[in-house]
Amino acid sequence: MKRLAHFLALAVYCWSCTENPIGVEVPDGSLSSPVAGAKLAARSDIYVVRHGGEEVFRVEALKWRNGHRGVVSVTYDAPWGINEVFSLATDAAIARDLRMDLEIVSSKLEHPQRFHIIERMQRELRPHGIGFFGHGHEHIHYDWYGFEAAYEAFRTNFELMREWGLEPKTYAYPHWAGKLYGTQAANRQAGFIAARGGLRRPESRSEYYICPDDTREPNNWYFMPSVIMGAKNGTDIPHHDALAPILQGALDAGAWVILTYHSIGNPEGWGYYPFAEFERDLDHIAANDFWSGNLDEVTAYIKERNALDIQIVRYFGVGTPKQFELTIGDGLDNALYDEPLTFEFNFNPELRVRWVHFDPPIGDESSFAIEEDRLQVELVPDERRYALVLERDSE
């Protein structure tokens, strides 16, 4: 079989929401490249591969992992390990295979007598999907102290988390600080890629929603809204029945919503929230079409998807090509942005593709059966080159 190798054209016609317009330059002369091309189709995360004017397949990076309708991140501002009452919540999340994130106030853990708590976190929590967010070196209102003090505290928090192997990426401001641009800038310069704030009694529950509908990123990565859970101390959502409409709205809008809890099952603690109500919240999340995602995971997913670039490098075969080589990347730091995206491949039904073989393999799998002309796989957009071999029914 004669082996043909052509560089394919990448012609880009894309639009997205007004918050994040995207434009890609087409190299000179590439529009006249022969017979094949990969181009963006209507949205910046769908790529269509054609040969001789016929669509072979299209690739879409789904908005949320595994095509879920919405996303929930459960964040817990509590000093896990200081008192066993704080394990109630993490045990409940782990029992339901749901993700959850915990605060790290580094001054509370930097003393040698508390190093065993960090060891327990690594051993008992991280393997079960419990993540960690920076919460300051001290638990103070950083808007009150200016840029320099905030930066020093954020950077110390970041560096200690990294030293302890907690892989810092995201942050949450104590006392609902972070409203000042200087505080946000300090957080960004300290190394965090996003930060959670708090939203007190919004006029509309839609203000809680991050990336609703076609919106591609938060209004402000360094002051993301969250739902303030709690039955006392002026907190907003005292029980599950008050939360349920907010969660339903997130599903309807295809949005991400962050929940902030304090003192779950601890009546003496600030912002007490009944444990039975927390269990109802978790059961509701598990029973509905939510991606239960850590702050780090969801943040990286959104940023990688927005920066996605798929290049069809070449193809092989006589007639309609059977093998394609493509690179999937995002141009971001792969040491920091290492979250798999969910890609959906849709094949032209007339081609009757039954198997797709990947080289290198995806995880431990190299061959995937095609059902109803569709395949979903999880890939990190780390600029790796993949060979895809299409096996058709007639072969």
Located regions from the model:
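Short linear, low-complexity motifs centered on an aromatic residue
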Residues: 1-2, 309
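Sec-dependent signal peptide recognition
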Residues: 2-13
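Short, low-complexity, disordered segments immediately C-terminal to signal peptides
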Residues: 21-35
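C-terminal active-site subregion of NodB/CE4 polysaccharide deacetylases
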Residues: 32-83, 179-387
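Metal-dependent polysaccharide deacetylase catalytic core of the NodB/CE4 family, i.e.
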Residues: 70-72, 82, 93-185, 189-228, ...
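Solvent-exposed, polar/charged alpha-helical surfaces in well-ordered, non-transmembrane soluble domains
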Residues: 87, 91, 152-155, 159, ...
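Short acidic/polar inter-strand loop motif in beta-rich domains
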Residues: 393-395
